A protein has these predicted regions:
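Catalytic alpha/beta core domains of metabolic enzymes, predominantly
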Residues: 128-129, 142-248
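Conserved, mostly hydrophobic/aromatic
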Residues: 22, 35, 67, 96, ...
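Alpha/beta enzyme core
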Residues: 29-43, 90-104, 123-131, 149-162
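Glycine-rich, proline-tolerant flexible connector loops at the mouths of alpha/beta enzymes
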Residues: 40-66, 81-87, 106-118
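Alpha-helix-loop-beta-strand connector modules within alpha/beta enzyme cores
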Residues: 54-79, 119-136, 180-181
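C-terminal alpha-helical cap/extension of soluble enzyme domains
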Residues: 9-17, 34, 38-40, 49, ...
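Hydrophobic faces of well-ordered beta-strands that scaffold small-molecule active sites
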Residues: 8-14, 42-45, 77-81, 104-106, ...
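Short, small-residue-biased leader/transition segments that mark boundaries at the very start
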Residues: 1-3
Length: 295
């Protein structure tokens, strides 16, 4: 199986359940089993949705280990291993490989604003330290820097850099990336609301926040997209769209953690500086969950 096929489909950007000041390991394991039983195609622990900025290094590594062990190779695990410190990203990536992850999701360095040359050098250094397939996580809305398609094309020449999680919401870029780099460069969207358009333009899948609470709907939606049955996909998308909106009214993952707590998947615990959502937002999430027949 080629790398592109290995990582296509609907992947869940997993939340990290907490119990007070600790990771709720039991709820995390149960969430993973729930995802797989509902048909999700892959799991992504300790990314943005997993609150990686507020996890200690020990917690970060523990979450990867739990996910890999509980998944037991039933679906691919793409571990979040990014940092704005190249040495730290290398350490997290090497740990993910040792733990048994199937791939690494590496965010573009945030805050320190590297040039395109700096971005290339950062990913090149990480690639030399691991044999894991690396997926670039391009999210300029959070990291400030935006990796262009030329830099991605150059990085794709490195054997184990295999694709991008594109969280730009820039749909024409899907076509630009495909024509600049080629169809074997794996394109996964990180924006739930534009996933349908992303797939129409030639995407290979998604890394989704919404699928934390609606894995069955999201995986069925993605199956129709991959089968080029966009009429059926659109029907499911209509069920999910209010949820895609409501889960981002306040800073993610606060809304999806509330929604997950409504389903009994975890407690509504989130770490500062993020806070639990307002009552007004809770009403929006509840309404969207009802629209999707989740409650």
């Amino acid at each position: 199986m080629c790398i592109r096929d290995r990582f296509k489909g609907s992947h869940t950007a997993l939340i990290t359940p907490f119990d007070g000041k600790s990771i709720d390991e039991k709820s995390f394991s149960s969430l993973i089993d729930f995802q797989i039983s509902e048909g999700i195609h892959g799991l992504v622990p300790v990314g943005t949705t997993g609150e990686s900025p507020t996890l200690s290094h020990e917690e970060h590594k523990l979450a990867v280990e739990i996910c890999v062990e509980e998944t037991a190779k039933r679906v691919p695990v793409i571990a979040g291993t990014g940092s704005n410190n190249t040495d730290e990203a290398i350490d997290l990536t090497m740990h993910a490989e040792k733990a048994g992850a199937d791939g690494a999701l590496v965010v573009t360095p945030y805050y320190n604003k590297p040039t395109q040359h700096g971005l290339y050098s950062h990913f090149e250094a990480i690639s030399k330290a691991t044999t894991l397939p690396i997926i670039i996580y391009n999210i300029p809305g959070r990291s400030i820097v935006d990796m262009n398609t030329k830099t991605m094309r150059d990085l794709f020449k490195i054997k184990n850099i295999v694709g991008v999680k594109d969280a730009t919401s820039d749909i024409p870029r899907v076509y630009e990336t495909k024509t600049t780099i080629g169809e074997n460069f794996n394109q996964l969207t990180g924006d739930d609301a534009t996933t349908l358009a992303f797939m129409v333009y030639g995407g290979h899948g998604s890394i989704s926040v919404t699928s934390n609470i609606a894995p069955k709907l999201c995986s069925e939606f993605m199956k129709h997209c991959l089968d080029q049955n966009f009429a059926k996909a659109s029907e499911i998308n209509d069920k999910l769209m209010p949820l895609h909106h409501a889960l981002f009214v306040e800073s993610s993952p606060a809304p999806v953690k509330y929604a997950a707590s409504k389903l009994g998947l975890c407690k509504d615990d989130i770490r500062l500086p993020l806070t639990s959502i307002s009552d007004e937002t809770k009403q929006l999430v509840d309404k969207a969950m009802k629209h999707a027949s989740l409650i």
